[in-house]
Amino acid sequence: MKQMSSAQIRQMWLDFWASKGHSVEPSVSLVPVNDPTLLWINSGVATLKKYFDGTIIPENPRITNAQKAIRTNDIENVGKTARHHTMFEMLGNFSIGDYFRDEAITWAYELLTSPEWFDFPAEKLYMTYYPDDKDSYNRWIEVGVDPSHLIPIEDNFWEIGAGPSGPDTEIFFDRGEAFDPENIGLRLLAEDIENDRYIEIWNIVLSQFNADPAVPRSEYKELPHKNIDTGAGLERLVAVIQGAKTNFETDLFMPIIREVEKLSGKVYDQDGDNMSFKVIADHIRSLSFAIGDGALPGNEGRGYVLRRLLRGASMHGQKLGINEPFLYKLVPTVGKIMESYYPEVLEKRDFIEKIVKSEEESFARTLHSGQHFAETIVADLKAKGQNVIAGQDVFKLYDTYGFPVELTEEIAEEAGMTVDREGFEVAMKEQQERARASAVKGGSMGMQNETLQNITVESVFNYNASQLPSKLVAIVAENAEVEAVSEGTASLIFAETPFYAEMGGQVADHGQILDATGNLVATVTDVQKAPNGQALHTVEVLAPLALNQEYTLAIDTNRRHRVMKNHTATHLLHAALHNILGHHATQAGSLNEVEFLRFDFTHFQAVTPEELRAIEQQVNEKIWEAIAVETVETDIDTAKEMGAMALFGEKYGKEVRVVTIGDYSVELCGGTHVGNTSEIGLFKIVKEEGIGSGTRRILAVTGKEAFEAYREQEDALKAVAATLKAPQLKEVPHKVEGLQEQLRQLQKENAELKEKAAAAAAGDVFKDVKEVNGHRYIVSQVSVSDAGALRTFADNWKQKDYSDVLVLVAAIGDKVNALVASKTKDIHAGNLVKELAPIVDGRGGGKPDMAMAGGSNQAKIQELLEAVAGKL
């Protein structure tokens, strides 16, 4: 077996499959593009779903890739096992309706065992297969595998919901008896026992059925086009080839671990407790790549995953004695390890470091809050005479504040308590099940549409024409190809079309189809790309249409021009965001509609009003400069030399279309645009909002819609001016400031009156002093307008020695408000109010000297008042 670096292993994989006629697909962003079903790209095939379900026919049916992926379902196992990771690379080879089982198995065996390639010892390889899949069993024997190395496994059948499915055959490497201390042998494989001896290095899925959850597997229909989908984990291959005990002792992780050794002063011991080193090395890889791809830490979705990874790694740093931000210092090391295939980490190093360091500093503050929460839990339990921290509280400390359960156990031990480990595990399992359910939901592929896949006639889109004659070359009605159609809805393909098919965030053209005499025969309501790339016109048929006849296709030019204005404005907006917010503000999604444009972009905070104004101003300046908008068709390398901005994660062909707006904007784009920015007229941002962690959205309008938006604002301002009796619009702010000053004065006078009234009422309330167990206390229901008045009562009470404890309750609206104040260390106001609040179906808390509560059951106020004495 050859000795190779991880970079050499990755490249050898790609070179082998390229030699077998495969196109090498570059790794795409971890953040899915146009796939809302996925939180992350979680496999090599995730980016190829459109090919497997037949939505798009690839230029080459043979594809290979090395794809970065993230899975966090088993995050708790990272560092505990030899092979679990949150981010990993999946090597794959794929056949979309081309070769199948025989070639897939033959070539897999060649790549692994040939001296020209990996040169694995054949006797070290074992294969599992689906028991009913005799063809795979026979093929393995034909290529030279000993039958005793073939293990039938009932679970070797791949399916996730409806769509492509089929048997799979897995390849394992035997690391020998040293990794099988109980000498269990092949039972480890046959009975699927977790082990470190037989390492799965490759899974070959033979996708030959359309899975249908409504019928038994035996009734699945054969796919019209059978596929091959394989995956080999690079980290596992590297560990086997480099003879490493675990994946972490390879050149993918050890440079990171060495840096952690320097930062911590601790030494990584392969045979000792090295979990913290492993977790840090794993998590910083995920953080570096995900942030580089535009995901940012936050409280939901992808952002929550990243925040959890960072906090976990940070806590493990503390275990190693690193008590300051340090993860950001590891980013360059990650970048250097992966530079040969993933240069983007080093290219975006400064931005990634900035985000990681900022998040580390934020977590330090959160840890302090978590410490306070833990102390509150301990104090409450002591007050109740209890000594077990509930599982849900342990989980909240873990999930919200980043406390490992071990840290909570240490806090509990110091307080003479224990934690409910079982309850914590239940809460953790519930979260994992939710994550797995979410992952399964996003994994299914759609059913293949055989009719559309089989239509291979050519169809050309004419960018410059708004109307042209063209031959009708395909008609699909009721999911079948037909010769003619006379009514209803149908899908049509023409030899040439002026209709733009929805793509790249630009909506489809609408329009009309006319016959040779100029009569309207159909209206076009939508245009989408067919699997083989043709424009598929969805039409409402008004008169008979026949195959191979010529018709006139006419787009709605007014609609097209309005969309074009919005699309060109989107390019201007993208450039302005780069200039004003920074180059990290890249496109995360867009929609160019008839009446508006919507643009999603990566940014880690809300855009300020000043920034929005500057962005809007810059876009309008470029519109008023009347810059020519030009398009150039060229190859991808030339486009990059031109400085064309490509959307990371999008796939581009050999020939691309570059849209330039002077030297202000250069982007790869297949959409339609105005000829000059002056045609846009006017640009106005109408809304900016967050739509997820690290992602912002701008809604804007152009032309007539922008003018109407300004007019609407002007009308509203005029209405305000009329109400304020301001003769000129510019006087409105002054008038409003005057009203605000009057309001502040009235509020001040009102507060003073309330204080006087409260002081007068307090005189009566504070006279009724009672005593129990040596504690003087006052308890009373008072009539006040808001909770603030209760605090005023308490402030007056503090001024004199009326009593040791004060309890006030008020019915305000349909709610109950309560206040507890204490001057004695024996009575903790926060704890007392927590005991009283449930009586009125409420909850509360606070400090030892003052606390508040709210409730909803006013009928129980008297019961609460009577309960006070028993609590003191």
Curated annotation (Swiss-Prot):
Cofactor note as given: Binds 1 zinc ion per subunit.
Record key words, sorted: Aminoacyl-tRNA synthetase, ATP-binding, Cytoplasm, Ligase, Metal-binding, Nucleotide-binding, Protein biosynthesis, RNA-binding, tRNA-binding, Zinc
The protein, known as: Alanine--tRNA ligase
Enzyme Commission number(s): 6.1.1.7
Gene Ontology molecular function terms on file: alanine-tRNA ligase activity; aminoacyl-tRNA deacylase activity; ATP binding; catalytic activity, acting on a protein; transferase activity; tRNA binding; zinc ion binding
Provenance organism: Streptococcus gordonii (strain Challis / ATCC 35105 / BCRC 15272 / CH1 / DL1 / V288)
CDD domains xrefs: AlaRS_core
Main location: cytoplasm
One of the Pfam families matching this protein, by short name: tRNA-synt_2c
Domain text: Consists of three domains; the N-terminal catalytic domain, the editing domain and the C-terminal C-Ala domain. The editing domain removes incorrectly charged amino acids, while the C-Ala domain, along with tRNA(Ala), serves as a bridge to cooperatively bring together the editing and aminoacylation centers thus stimulating deacylation of misacylated tRNAs.
UniProt catalytic activity: tRNA(Ala) + L-alanine + ATP = L-alanyl-tRNA(Ala) + AMP + diphosphate
A cellular component annotation (GO) from this entry: cytosol
Entry-linked SUPFAM superfamilies: Class II aaRS and biotin synthetases (SSF55681), Putative anticodon-binding domain of alanyl-tRNA synthetase (AlaRS) (SSF101353), ThrRS/AlaRS common domain (SSF55186), Translation proteins (SSF50447)
Ligase found in the keyword field: yes
